[in-house]
Amino acid sequence: MNKSKVLVIGLDGVSFRLINEWMRNNQLPTLRSLMEDGCWSELESVYPPLTPAAWTSFYTGKNPGKHGLFDYQLRRQGSYQMIPTHSAMVKSDSLFKILSRKGKKVGVVNVPMTYPADSVNGFMITGLFTPDTGDLNKTNFTYPQQLKEEIMKVSGQYRIYPRFFYTKGNIEELVSDYYTLIDQKINVAMHCMRSKPWDFMMLVINETDHIQHQLWHLLDKNHPDYDAREAQRYADVFLKVYQRVDAGLSQLLEIIDKKNTNIVVMSDHGLGPVYKWINLNTWLLRKGYIAIKQRPLSLLKHIMFRFGFTPANIYRLMLRFSRNKVVEKNKLSEKRGFVSRFFLNENDIDWSATKAYSIGHMGQININMKGREPQGVVEPSAQDAVMNELITALTGIKDRDSSGRQVDAIKQVLKKGELFWGPYAKEAADLYLKVSREEYHILGGATFISNRLIERSYGNTATHRTDGIFIACGPAINKSQHLSKPPKIYELAANILYMLGIPIPGDFDGKVIEALFTPEFLSQNEIIYQDVRQEQSATYKAAQAKAGLTDDEIRAAKEMLKKLGYVRD
C-alpha cells in the first residue's frame, strides 16, 4: 500500500519570468533547491486566466466546462444581476473530497474558491473569496468549525485579506502587512501539520499575487505609473516579499518527512503589466449592440456620457486637483456606489433592444439570446450570425502605439466551444477576446466607466497571464529535469492522485505525466484510470436546497472583489 504523502504549495500569480533571476542568484534558495532536486516547467492556466476558474480547475482536475465556474461572478438566474462565485457552485467533486472518500487524511489551508468550508476527512481553512464580513468568527471558514478558535490562538488575529491597498507613500505599511499575512499562513499551516494527521496537505500564499497587482509599476520603467524616485526607494520590496515566502517554505520543509513526501509548488497563473484598458461595453454601445432606455434621465446621462461625464474622467480630475497627489487605487470603486445614479450604468440599459453585452473580468461577451437571457432579443437561430459579425468587427479595433503607429488591439476572438468542453460549457460566455499586446486589459464588467474605447489604465498596475509555475520534488520524482511540454493546470490533480496511489477518475481532463516520475516509481505503481460517469458534486447538490451565501456574505464578497480590483461596477 502507498504510504507516501503529498505537500502542495500554491504561490498565487507567480511566473518564472519574475523569479528566474532571483533563483539564479540564489536569492530564493528554497525554490532553487526544489527545482534542482526535481522537475519543473511553466504551468499553463485556463483561458481567461481568472483566479476562480484556475484554482477550481486545479482541484477538480477538469476544465471549466466540466465544473461550471468561469469567472469571479455569474449572472443570477432570471436576471442580469451579477453575484460572486463560490465553492458551492462547483458542479464537480474536488481532489479533497476524492481523497477523503479514499480514506486519506486531508489538510487544506487558504486555498481560493473553497468557501463555504467543505467537510473533508481532515481539516479545511478557506481562502480567497471568503466573504470579508469584518468578523471571521461569524463566518463558516473552517472545517471543523471549532478549528476557528484554535487558529485564532495560534495566529493572534487570523486574516485572509490585506488591510491596505497601494497609495502614494504607504508602501512600507503595505509590505509590512504582507509580511504579517505570509507569517500567519505559514504558522497556521505548520501548527496544523504538526498537530493533525495528514496524507495530503495544501497551502496557498496570495501575497505573491497581491504585490504584483499593486506594485508592478515599481519594476517597469515603461509603465505609465512608473515613478523613478519611488522605484529607487523601494526597488527591493518585491524580492523581500518573495524571500519572506521562500523562508516560510523552508520552515515547512523542515517539519516533513522528505523520504516519504512528494512536494508540488505551483501557481494558478502569472502576471504582467497593464498599460491600457479596452472598454468593451463602450464599444458595444457605440456600435449599437447595447441600447439605452428612452426615458429622460437615461437619455440625459447618455448625452453626458458622450461628452465625457464618466467615472474615469471624474477620477482623473480628482487626481489632478488633489493637493497631496495621492493616487488611491480604489477610491473610484469606493465612491462609485454614492455617485452611480449620476453616471450612465447598467440600470440605463434597455435590455429589450440590446443584442450583446460584456460582463466578464477580461471582456467576455454574451449574446442577449431569446429564451436564455431574461429579456433576450436575438433568436437562437441568429446567434451564430451575430457572433460572426462581432468577431469581424472586434478584430478590426485599432490603437496607436507609443510611436503613433496604428496597431491591432484585438488579436483573436474565440467562441466558447473553442475553449471549453463538458456538460457545463454552455454556461460560459459566448465570446472570449485575446488582446494583441499583453499590456492591454479588456474591461467588461465595468459597464460604462469611460467614454473612451482605449485609454491609459489606472488602479492595479498588473494583470493576469496564462504562464504559471510548476515544480515537483520528492522520492517519486525525476531529478533535475525540465518538462518539455508544460502541463495544464487541470492535469495536476491526476498526478497528485497517482503519487498517493489513488485511481484517477476517467472524467478528469488530466492524465499522468510519465516524464515526471522515476522509472522505479512507474514500475512499482500501476496507473489506473477509473471509469466513472461525471456527476454533480454532493456539495453542489446540497447547495441547491439552500443558498450558498447569505445576502450579507454576497455583499461582503462583492466589496472585497472590488477592493482587490477584480470587479468594477
Regions found by a protein language model. Give the residues of each.
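Beta-strand elements within well-structured catalytic alpha/beta cores of enzymes
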Residues: 3-15, 19-20, 34, 58, ...
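Secreted, luminal/periplasmic, and some membrane-associated catalytic domains
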Residues: 72-102, 109, 117-122, 129, ...
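Polar, surface-exposed loop/tail segments
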Residues: 277, 401-428, 483-485, 491, ...
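Active-site-proximal alpha/beta segments of enzymes that process anionic O-linked groups
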Residues: 3, 16-198, 206-213, 308, ...
